[in-house]
Amino acid sequence: MDPNPRAALERQQLRLRERQKFFEDILQPETEFVFPLSHLHLESQRPPIGSISSMEVNVDTLEQVEFIDLADQDGADVFLPCEESSPAPQMSGVDDHPEELSLLVPTSDRTTSRTSSLSSDSSNLRSPNPSDGGGDTPLAQSDEEDGDDGGAEPGPCS
């Protein structure tokens, strides 16, 4: 080994002291270092780690939105309150601007109702038995389908 055991012992003690100092520096926090207050206030403005930006979320939301023309009377009857009097072509002062109104409606509800109406009767345990004569009735009716089911379709107020 080493011809001088004393020098080897001193080098080993020096390495042990350096290791001890290294771990003391890491494990003991320095009291003189303080985070600036601006760092704490910016946390709410930073995007969450690993998430997509809010701009991408807004674009995705807009792609899923369907515009409904409120100038179309059939579509407007669903969203506008009913009047007891006969429908007038224009109320005084309310619709002075003939601009087109539109309403944003998410398409996910319509897609869900179509999916449930197209599902097979065998997969739904509560579906009517085809031998009872109820096999041809849909489970859910979408807004676009016209059905005569006794006033379920919104119409003019009476």
UniProtKB/Swiss-Prot annotation:
Single GO BP term: neuron projection development
Residue numbers bearing the Phosphothreonine modification: T137
Keywords from the named record: Phosphoprotein
Modified residues (Phosphoserine): S119, S120, S142
Bias type Acidic residues, positions: 142-151
Source organism superkingdom: Eukaryota
Gene Ontology terms for molecular function: ATPase binding
Annotated stretches, region: Disordered: 79-158
Ranges annotated as biased composition (Low complexity): 106-131
A GO term from the CC aspect: lysosome
Family named by the database record: Belongs to the dysbindin family.
Purpose of the protein: May modulate the activity of casein kinase-1. Inhibits CSNK1D autophosphorylation (in vitro).
Subunit structure: Monomer. Interacts with CSNK1D and CSNK1E.
PANTHER family in the cross-refs: DYSBINDIN DOMAIN-CONTAINING PROTEIN 2 (PTHR16294:SF7), DYSTROBREVIN BINDING PROTEIN 1 DYSBINDIN (PTHR16294)
Record protein name field: Dysbindin domain-containing protein 2
Originating species: Mus musculus (Mouse)
